[in-house]
Amino acid sequence: MPVAATNSESAMQQVLDNLGSLPNATGAAELDLIFLRGIMESPIVRSLAKAHERLEETKLEAVRDNNLELVQEILRDLAELAEQSSTAAELARILQEPHFQSLLETHDSVASKTYETPPPSPGLDPTFSNQPVPPDAVRMVGIRKTAGEHLGVTFRVEGGELVIARILHGGMVAQQGLLHVGDIIKEVNGQPVGSDPRALQELLRSASGSVILKILPSYQEPHLPRQVFVKCHFDYDPARDSLSPCKEAGLRFNAGDLLQIVNQDDANWWQACHVEGGSAGLIPSQLLEEKRKAFVKRDLELTPTSGTLCGSLSGKKKKRMMYLTTKNAEFDRHELLIYEEVARMPPFRRKTLVLIGAQGVGRRSLKNKLILWDPDRYGTTVPYTSRRPKDSEREGQGYSFVSRGEMEADIRAGRYLEHGEYEGNLYGTRIDSIRGVVASGKVCVLDVNPQAVKVLRTAEFVPYVVFIEAPDYETLRAMNRAALESGVSTKQLTEADLRRTVEESSRIQRGYGHYFDLSLVNSNLERTFRELQTAMEKLRTEPQWVPVSWVY
């Protein structure tokens, strides 16, 4: 084996030490290098490298595979010497011993590879499930449990028999490894089980102490699933789900929770567990939940119309719309949000910080405070406008000035993240401006409309999205009064303005909450700013969960 490969630890460390020079040499993206470092530093990968090193070691080969013939030649040569030397006689006696002869015979068989592997056990034909079972095919499995304890297994009826449908990851049965999917349950504590899955579940749940199961093994080979992690975008309570095959085996979760999917064999029900730990449970699959949420009423509703004959129908046609980016908020309201596949990344700095919130909630104040606090680390874009510059204004200081025709052409070409018109003039944020701030090595801080997050949420911008939530009405009014008294603000908000801010904040949270990485209630600007600082520092020291599309 080559010397350079004898020490996998030093070889991997050498790769890690040289990752910093890869961007210049290969043009690799920063996010790809972060992902590569996370893989290289993973204990699993290091263990695999050690295993590979062991497997690649020089294999021992037999010198010869006819040692029995060689021993016979030696014995013939020793025949004459044995009469003259006691040592030769002892050697001849050892070489002729049955145990030594068997050892040499076994060695020669292995060296010449003349051995045969026995054929695998054939699977059982389900068509014979109702025929008498040979006594040697039945197994007895013993389980100790307490009353009310769930075994972590569900059943189905197949050919009149109760068959194990699924084994929940992390449950009692999965940990013991004595039962497998497809096993047929014949008896429980000597009593036939019948053909009712719910009755069997209740019998097993109420049993305590030693439970003896008579089973007919399935001989199915289990397969190892790939690791899948998802972020949930809805709340789920199995106790309230009428479709659940086993409410006790369900897993409860809330929107924003991170789950590991451990089994997806069933098209409608997956097995999952919380990434923080705990036993696995059943959750509705992506397909099942999409069907449930997409269920709509029939086109014709049986509602009587005045002035018509009895029994006539009032028809309601479905509204058809062509997708327009200018009206994407309408489509966002009808987007089905179930699960989002995510991946765990080592600590890294996000390229953009996106502040989302209602108008007047304090986004711009937080952005300005963050840039003033660390201008070498944070920056922002200069907005573009089609209005003419004032005498005191300079290009790039406050605004970048372009003609209306040029700006309209760039808007049609999709070069603006967002844009609007005020008093006959266009204003907007160019996407290239964001790229420029990121290229300078700074985090680009943006306070944009919620619709813009869909454009930014890519591997190019890897945004950290923070929702600045409005406090309750009374707190918001007190904050505005304090800002007026301290001279921080000169605009007094009316009662309608305050209520509008609170209502808009709630609408944004309902419609775009699945995009938020963090939510901060801005009831005190200084406290909210400190919480934002802390969150940004954690990104540099703690692992992060990001959409899997950013990684692969």
Swiss-Prot record:
Residues 225-293 form the SH3 domain. Keywords: Cell projection, Cytoplasm, Cytoskeleton, Membrane, Phosphoprotein, Repeat, SH3 domain, Synapse. Gene3D superfamilies: 2.30.42.10, L27 domain, P-loop containing nucleotide triphosphate hydrolases, SH3 Domains. It comes from the Eukaryota. Residues 350-537 form the Guanylate kinase-like domain. Residues 8-59, 60-118 form the L27 domain. The modification Phosphothreonine is found at residue 117. The keyword Heme does not apply. GO terms for cellular component: cytoplasm; cytoskeleton; dendrite membrane; dendritic shaft; dendritic spine; glutamatergic synapse; postsynaptic density; postsynaptic density membrane. Expressed in pyramidal neurons of CA1 region of the hippocampus. Disulfide bonds: none annotated. Transmembrane segments: none annotated. Postsynaptic MAGUK scaffold protein that links CADM1 cell adhesion molecules to core components of the postsynaptic density. In CA1 pyramidal neurons, required for synaptic KCNN2-containing channel function and long-term potentiation expression. Seems to negatively regulate SRC function in epithelial cells. This is MAGUK p55 subfamily member 2.
